[in-house]
A protein has these predicted regions:
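N-terminal, membrane-interfacial amphipathic/helix-forming hydrophobic leader that caps
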Residues: 1-62, 78, 144-148, 155, ...
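Transmembrane helix-loop-helix hairpins at the membrane interface
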Residues: 103-211
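Alpha-helical transmembrane segments and their membrane-interface exit regions
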Residues: 43-55, 101, 160-170
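Juxtamembrane helix-loop-helix connectors linking adjacent transmembrane helices
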Residues: 54-113, 148-156, 204-211
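Short juxtamembrane and helix-loop transition motifs at transmembrane-helix boundaries
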Residues: 1-8, 64, 88-100, 118-125, ...
């Protein structure tokens, strides 16, 4: 009991409160264009993670090979999804990321999102409240993040929330097993294959099946 209390004392405020701050910004930015809003929300996560940076110290060291294990886990997770659901993914992603150039989508999905989201949800929230809480809140986070694109499509919003919770659980497991860097690598690999590649190569699933 004392050990848990000591761990929590490293945080300037409870991470539930930090998530509510994010939710407030998500609501306040609902009416601005999607691309700008997503950048703002990623920045909010990065700022919150920096505020909590003291809590990231003392993490156990993981060998560099664990980054490869995280990327491999992402590959194993992402390829079946791409092969089975590529047409649906292309349509959904076009709705969730409207008007973004390929370069902007790559920067956001593959570089910024994995870093910002894993630092907060796995490096902070999961560390304080556990794997399940981190996964469930990640599903809610994605629903809020993409809300303008799903507000008229309840089933898409539900799918985003449930898929986010499932991905969050997997990223959380990778984090517990191989460390935060591996979780970031896993997340980046999934985003690259599942969310970015269908945007730039619409027929990629058909090509892969033909190999």
């Amino acid at each position: 009991m004392g050990k848990r209390q000591s761990r929590k004392s490293n945080y300037p405020l409870d991470t539930w409160v930090a998530f509510l701050l994010y939710a407030g910004v998500a609501a306040a930015t609902f009416t601005i264009d999607a691309a700008s809003r997503q950048v703002v929300l990623w920045c909010v996560l990065l700022v919150l993670s920096l505020v909590y940076r003291q809590a990231l110290r003392g993490e156990p060291a993981h060998p560099p090979a664990d980054l490869g294990r995280g990327a491999a886990a992402g590959l194993i997770l992402a390829l079946p999804i791409l092969l089975l659901l590529q047409p649906e993914l292309t349509a959904i992603i076009a709705r969730l990321l409207p008007g973004q150039s390929d370069a902007a989508a790559f920067q956001g999905l593959v570089l910024i999102a994995p870093l910002a989201e894993e630092l907060f949800f796995r490096g902070l929230l999961q560390k304080q409240h556990g794997l399940v809480a981190g996964a469930l809140l990640y599903g809610v986070y994605l629903l809020l993040f993409f809300l303008p694109g799903v507000v008229d499509f309840a089933l898409v919003g539900l799918a985003v929330c449930l898929a986010g919770a499932l991905f969050g659980f997997i990223y959380g497991y990778v984090n517990e097993r191989y460390g935060l860097g591996a979780a970031i690598a896993c997340h980046a690999t999934v985003n690259l294959i599942v969310f970015f590649m269908p945007l730039v190569v619409p027929d990629i699933a058909r090509w892969l099946k033909a190999i």
